[in-house]
Amino acid sequence: MHVTLVEINVKEDKVEQFVEVFRANHQGSLLEPGNLRFDVLQDESIPTRFYIYEAYVDEAAVAAHKKTPHYLRCVEELEGLMTGPRKKTTFIGLMP
């Protein structure tokens, strides 16, 4: 299992727009054959900070995800909403 945790910091006045933009990516990702989990989390103490927890069966499924229309559209639309670049950390899932 290949897991990625993505931190996204959003401009204060763009939080609602971020949620709407990311909703389409979330829904599309859940339908991908290699997807095991795709959670969108909002930090309780910093409401402009979001974490995306993505679990895929393997790296090939992750690569396929990054070529999907919903992912590409989301990445493009996020550019004007973020305060800086996304921060990604990858993991090997041992025990789901």
Swiss-Prot record:
Localization per Swiss-Prot or TrEMBL: Cytoplasm
Single Gene Ontology MF annotation: oxidoreductase activity
One GO location term (cellular component): cytosol
Subunit structure: Homodimer.
Catalytic activity of the protein: (2S)-2-hydroxy-3,4-dioxopentyl phosphate = 3-hydroxy-2,4-dioxopentyl phosphate
EC annotation from Swiss-Prot or TrEMBL: 5.3.1.32
Leading EC class: isomerase
Functional description taken from the UniProt entry: Involved in the degradation of phospho-AI-2, thereby terminating induction of the lsr operon and closing the AI-2 signaling cycle. Catalyzes the conversion of (4S)-4-hydroxy-5-phosphonooxypentane-2,3-dione (P-DPD) to 3-hydroxy-5-phosphonooxypentane-2,4-dione (P-HPD).
Entry-linked InterPro entries: ABM_dom, AI-2_Isomerase_LsrG, Dimeric_a/b-barrel, LsrG
Keyword presence, rRNA processing: no
Domain (ABM) ranges: 2-91
Pfam families for the chain: ABM
Position of the signal peptide: none
Keyword flag Membrane: no
Homology family: Belongs to the LsrG family.
The name this protein goes by in its record: (4S)-4-hydroxy-5-phosphonooxypentane-2,3-dione isomerase
Alphabetic keyword roster: Cytoplasm, Isomerase
Species for this entry: Yersinia enterocolitica serotype O:8 / biotype 1B (strain NCTC 13174 / 8081)
Domain of life: Bacteria
Main location: cytoplasm
